[in-house]
Design a protein with these regions (language model features):
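Surface/interface-facing alpha-helical segments and adjacent flexible terminal/loop regions used
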Residues: 1-15, 19-118
Length: 118
């Protein structure tokens, strides 16, 4: 798999992670299903980001943060269909949450997962 393919795949896992973190922040609750999705997205994201032979990671911390920023709006749009069974638009949902807090939470979870699976 090429580096670009890996980055695209990592971005997909970031979007899934953010989608569920946005729902948690907006609804102020979680479900076992959301927790499993978060866990699986983190596990697959970290596995895909890890370089096998050379060691290290494809994306640096700065790249991870930039990637989370980049996919946030798509995750917010998709979360608007799921949070409260789609009662709110993405714009309304964005007013219920703090974008920086959600992105920082996602980054912290990625960091923690990288450290515990190293």
């Amino acid at each position: 798999m090429s580096r670009d393919d890996k980055i695209t795949r990592i971005a997909s896992f970031m979007e899934i992670l953010l989608l569920h973190l946005i729902k948690q922040a907006a609804e102020q609750r979680t479900t076992p299903s959301w927790e499993r999705s978060i866990h699986n997205a983190l596990r697959h994201l970290v596995r895909t980001n890890k370089r096998r032979k050379a060691g290290g990671y494809y994306l640096t911390d700065a790249d991870l943060l930039a990637g989370l920023e980049e996919v946030f709006d798509d995750a917010l749009y998709n979360a608007s269909f799921e949070a409260w069974v789609g009662q709110y638009t993405a714009e309304a949902l964005s007013r219920m949450i703090d974008r920086r807090v959600v992105i920082q939470r996602a980054f912290d979870l990625i960091q923690h997962t990288q450290q515990t699976t190293a």
